């Protein structure tokens, strides 16, 4: 279905309603039938609410096929239609705390609950609270305890038969257990994919050179609606039961929470993240508690669901045209939204990395107003075909940096401009270069670049570096912008009068910072190396360098071959270290830091060179009792010769040293053809006389 024609203004309600209906139907088709949603949930909800409002104000504009009158979606060709005995309705949505309070008030009024003179409910309603999964709703039919059919929701009245595909989902029992087995039971629930399974699936897709899925919901929907059930069987799908359709041959539980408890006794998977609460306060407490844990959950959710718990009260409240009055879906702030990309700038990172950044028309997404979003690198911009002027989908989840997911291509204006990576750094004018094997372009300005200077100073002061307490980003900004500090060495020249003159920097703060700088002068070699901000050199590598060389000068003058002898230093890291110390400006700054005792550390001798004998780098396993040596003594001798002593035999084992009563390790060595030595043979190797 093509996108709707030009969007009419709100001043033309008839045309606007027709456009909204067409746009929502097109989005429904993409979402339910094609499994290729192209409209963020927040944008769909906004359009849907607008159509509801227009139809409420102009009842004559309501049409029987309006999306407000049904759930959405049509049965796709290739699957047999299934008419639901009981419609699979959607739920009304709430987005703010006020919506939940209003819902509770409507329910209480509908149940004639007692209120005080101010209208506050004094007889709280009992609710069952659950998670709102971001998956695909289905109905499972069991007859006399045996699974016989599964269908998708479809348009709420008619879905698609996906029985064979559902049979492949291990979480769904093919036979119910327990004693209260009904003659017929329609179980309503959600097929979804856990985050870890989604990541593994995309790894397999990449390895096979196949298209990756955008998110777990798309992966679940696409997997479930395969015409070949073998493909579905290869996909890691899961299921949670949360509702009921038809029930025959057993008593309906009195409460919704009781229904879910009963489901568990039948062997159906039910999510444990649920609660029974009372009143609006209980609902909101559950919502905010789940919201705090949302990112740590093993699956995606987009909200929570509230249902009046007592079945008789549900029956009294009944339904409106497309949703039950007794339930509400309380949705989290949308994690994706549409907005316009105004410009693409570039930011310069601490190591000179150039990152394209999208400048956006302000949009509320993920609980915050977003005006900037990362584009990662030049290749990502090209791959996603993102252009200036595009309407784009922006995603912000939790504390993750907002990113541009994709461009909406059929909304692209004729004058949209492609992004061109600048050739000069916007901060210092230095040349920008990109190495052939790297995705990131970098400024070559080193510590001369103001952007890198700020970041380098911030890194230098971090707790795991020189630990300069009180030297935050805002102070660094002022010091650099006022040209008071150009390199880390300048920090130690700062005086009290200079610091108190800074904006919002009191005398006490100035004295504390001076004290911190004084303490930072006495550090360790490992911390100092880490503080320099050498690319690819983290805390662990800095410690290894300090341990291996013992002092700074040998590191600064070490050729690449010597650096490669350091534990866990490979060619890329060695080249990065070598290039850093080869740059004259970096050496000058280091000398300034060391001059006149500004920064000092205890130095030691270099670590003993690694043994180069026949056992160097070999893996040896000890087994049994040796004639004259304890196991520990033999291990020390082997390790001193450069060998690694392992606890089990594998194909990577080079030698097995066996004594009396050697067991399964000896048998495994003989099976794999690994050389087996006695104690005398071990001594021969230790002496360097390989046989």
Swiss-Prot record:
HAMAP family: DNA_ligase_A. SMART domains: BRCT (SM00292), HhH1 (SM00278), LIGANc (SM00532). One of its GO terms (biological process) is DNA replication. Disulfide bonds: none annotated. The keyword rRNA processing does not apply. Its cofactor is Mg(2+); Mn(2+). It comes from Burkholderia pseudomallei (strain 1710b). This is DNA ligase. It comes from the Bacteria. It catalyses: NAD(+) + (deoxyribonucleotide)n-3'-hydroxyl + 5'-phospho-(deoxyribonucleotide)m = (deoxyribonucleotide)n+m + AMP + beta-nicotinamide D-nucleotide. GO terms for cellular component: cytosol. GO terms for molecular function: DNA binding; DNA ligase (NAD+) activity; metal ion binding. SUPFAM superfamilies: BRCT domain, DNA ligase/mRNA capping enzyme, catalytic domain, Nucleic acid-binding proteins, RuvA domain 2-like. Zn(2+) binds at residues 425, 428, 443, 449. The active site is at 132 (n6-amp-lysine intermediate). The keyword NAD applies. InterPro entries: BRCT_dom, BRCT_dom_sf, DisA/LigA_HHH, DNA_ligase, DNA_ligase_AS, DNA_ligase_CS, DNAligase_adenylation, DNAligase_N. NAD(+) binds at residues 41-45, 90-91, 130, 153, 190, 307, 331. Its EC number is 6.5.1.2. DNA ligase that catalyzes the formation of phosphodiester linkages between 5'-phosphoryl and 3'-hydroxyl groups in double-stranded DNA using NAD as a coenzyme and as the energy source for the reaction. It is essential for DNA replication and repair of damaged DNA. Keywords: DNA damage, DNA repair, DNA replication, Ligase, Magnesium, Manganese, Metal-binding, NAD, Zinc. Residues 610-691 form the BRCT domain. Belongs to the NAD-dependent DNA ligase family. LigA subfamily. The gene is ligA.
């Amino acid at each position: 279905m093509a996108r709707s024609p030009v969007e009419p203004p709100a001043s033309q309600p008839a045309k606007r309603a027709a456009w909204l209906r067409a746009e929502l139907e097109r989005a429904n088709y993409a979402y339910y039938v094609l499994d290729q949603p192209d409209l963020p949930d927040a944008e769909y909800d906004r359009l849907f609410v607008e159509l509801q409002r227009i139809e409420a104000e102009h009842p004559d504009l309501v049409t029987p096929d309006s999306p407000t009158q049904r759930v959405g979606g049509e049965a796709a060709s290739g699957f047999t239609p299934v008419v639901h005995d009981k419609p699979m309705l959607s739920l009304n949505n709430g987005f703010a705390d006020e919506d939940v309070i209003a819902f509770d008030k409507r329910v209480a009024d509908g149940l004639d609950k007692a209120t005080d003179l101010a209208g506050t409910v004094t007889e709280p309603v009992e609710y069952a609270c659950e998670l709102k999964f971001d998956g695909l709703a289905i109905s499972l039919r069991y007859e006399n305890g045996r699974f016989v059919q599964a269908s998708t929701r479809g348009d709420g009245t008619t879905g698609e038969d996906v029985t064979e595909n559902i049979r492949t989902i291990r979480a769904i029992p093919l036979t119910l257990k327990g004693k209260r087995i009904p003659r017929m039971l329609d179980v309503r629930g959600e097929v979804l994919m856990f985050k870890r399974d989604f990541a593994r699936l995309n790894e397999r897709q990449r390895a096979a050179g196949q298209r990756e899925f955008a998110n777990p919901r798309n992966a679940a929907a696409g997997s479930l609606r395969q015409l070949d059930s073998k493909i579905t069987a290869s996909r890691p799908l899961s299921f949670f039961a949360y509702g009921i359709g038809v029930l025959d041959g057993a008593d309906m539980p009195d409460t919704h929470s009781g229904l879910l408890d009963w489901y568990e006794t039948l062997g159906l998977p039910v999510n444990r993240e649920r609660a029974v609460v009372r009143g609006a306060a209980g609902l909101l407490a559950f919502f905010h508690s789940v919201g705090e844990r949302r990112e740590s959950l093993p699956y995606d959710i987009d909200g929570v669901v509230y249902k009046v718990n007592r079945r008789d009260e549900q029956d009294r409240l009944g339904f409106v045209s497309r949703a039950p009055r007794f339930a509400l879906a309380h949705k989290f702030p949308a994690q994706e939204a549409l907005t316009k990309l105004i410009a693409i700038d570039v930011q310069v990172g601490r190591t000179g990395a150039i990152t394209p950044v999208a400048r956006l028309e302000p949009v509320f997404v993920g609980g915050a107003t977003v005006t900037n979003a990362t584009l990662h690198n030049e290749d990502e911009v090209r791959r996603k075909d993102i252009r200036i002027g595009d309407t784009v989908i922006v995603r912000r989840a939790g504390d993750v940096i907002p990113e541009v997911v994709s461009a909406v291509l059929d909304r692209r204006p004729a004058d949209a401009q492609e992004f061109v990576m600048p050739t000069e750094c916007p901060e210092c004018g230095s040349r920008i270069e990109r190495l052939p094997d790297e995705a990131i372009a970098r400024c070559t300005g080193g510590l001369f670049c103001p952007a890198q200077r700020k970041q380098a100073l911030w890194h230098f002061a971090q707790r795991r570096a020189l630990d300069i307490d009180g030297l935050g980003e805002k102070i660094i900004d002022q010091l650099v912008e006022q040209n008071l500090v150009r390199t880390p060495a300048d920090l130690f020249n700062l005086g009290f009068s200079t610091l108190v003159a800074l904006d919002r920097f009191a005398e006490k703060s100035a004295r504390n910072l001076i004290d911190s700088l004084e303490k930072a002068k006495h550090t360790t070699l490992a911390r100092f190396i880490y503080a320099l901000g050498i690319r690819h050199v983290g805390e662990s590598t800095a410690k290894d360098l300090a341990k291996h060389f013992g002092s700074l000068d040998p590191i600064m003058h070490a050729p690449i071959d010597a650096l490669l002898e350091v534990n866990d230093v490979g060619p890329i890291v060695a080249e990065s270290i070598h290039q850093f110390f080869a740059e004259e400006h970096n050496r000058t700054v280091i000398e300034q830091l060391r001059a006149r005792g500004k920064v000092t550390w205890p130095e030691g001798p270099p670590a003993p060179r690694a043994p180069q004998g026949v056992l160097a780098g070999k893996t040896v396993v000890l087994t049994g009792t040796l004639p004259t040596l304890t196991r520990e003594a033999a291990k020390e001798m082997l390790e001193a010769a450069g060998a690694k002593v392992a606890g089990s035999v594998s194909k990577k084992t080079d030698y097995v040293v066996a004594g009396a009563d050697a067991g399964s390790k000896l048998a495994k060595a003989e099976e794999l053809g690994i050389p087996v030595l006695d104690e005398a043979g071990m001594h021969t190797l230790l002496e360097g006389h390989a046989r």
